Amino acid sequence: MACIIHTNRHNDTVLSKLQKDLSKSIEIGNKKYGGGQLKTVYVYQLDESVESRPCNIPFFYGLRLAKTNADVRIERPERKELATMGKRFVGTLRDEQTVSRNQALTLLTQHKSCILSCYTGFGKTVTAINMASKIKLPTLIAVPKKPLLAQWEQEIAKFIPTATVVVVDPSKIKSLPPQPECDFCIINTCNLEKLVKHDPKFVKTFGFLIVDEAHLQMTETMAENLLHVTPRYLLGITATPYRDDGYHVLFDMFFGPEMVKIKLNKKHTVYKVKTGFCPDESRYKKKKTLFHLPSRKSIGTPYWRSRPPIRKGTGSSWTLLRASRRAPF
């Protein structure tokens, strides 16, 4: 999920800004409090084998940079360069799903990227599939776990039964066609780098990228793999759009601040059931102690305080051994 900027076509001022902004010092292991280890993460990929030295930079960061700086030119695929996915969605969304879908589509039209953050059980997968049918572009779905591959495949077959779906098997990457004629492609993010090494043009055929469980994919390794994909529209799906380990800075660089957030406001019902059970309270009462610890005054001076300090060359053989192991001044 990146935009492309050709570094040889820009001046040193722009390149210095890129180097500064995309070299992030992240406090690894910082969960709500300080004390983590600082680590520099480079959030870009530079191809020096090409004369123009193209560089893949985070999606939203690239769009924002080009918008605020007239001298910057970025590459993002045009709709006319991509195929059309015109398959029909046969299901029906709930009212809250329809509202969130419309809000997300509006944000994608205006900002090209957003996050769909809804509570667990909301139906984010179905909503995203419906959005893909509205955008009408070949869709790449990146998931962080293997079980999610089959889950997405089943949901697509259920709601868009006429769609052609390709699930990338890492053991069969070499047999994939260079120009996949499919409506949906589902891949484990860990296998993206292997796929791009085999055929860099494969991922360029998709105009809509859906990043499932986005909070799990905002890590150094997975973000590096996702930089290979250059979509026209980007959607992140997560119920928890944050991280406590320092990598939260990647959210804004890739997806931006725009978010559709739906919270669960359902009231809980509490039922009171009479069981007739009466516990024996005497079993849980604290038992009285049969002895009392002596007070501090009655103990006197502790033995370890009454001993003289250990000095080198005096005392027992154990003392001399301990003293001889000290590092010299």
From Swiss-Prot:
Organism in which the protein naturally occurs: Invertebrate iridescent virus 3
Stated name of the protein: Putative helicase 109L
EC number: 3.6.4.-
Record-annotated disulphide pairs: none
Residues reported to bind ATP: 118-125
Keywords, sorted A to Z: ATP-binding, Helicase, Hydrolase, Nucleotide-binding
A GO MF label: ATP binding
Stated family: Belongs to the DEAD box helicase family. DEAH subfamily.
InterPro entries hit by this protein: ATP-dep_DNA_Helicase, Helicase/UvrB_N, Helicase_ATP-bd, P-loop_NTPase
UniProt domain Helicase ATP-binding: residue ranges: 105-259
Position of sequence motif DEAH box: 212-215
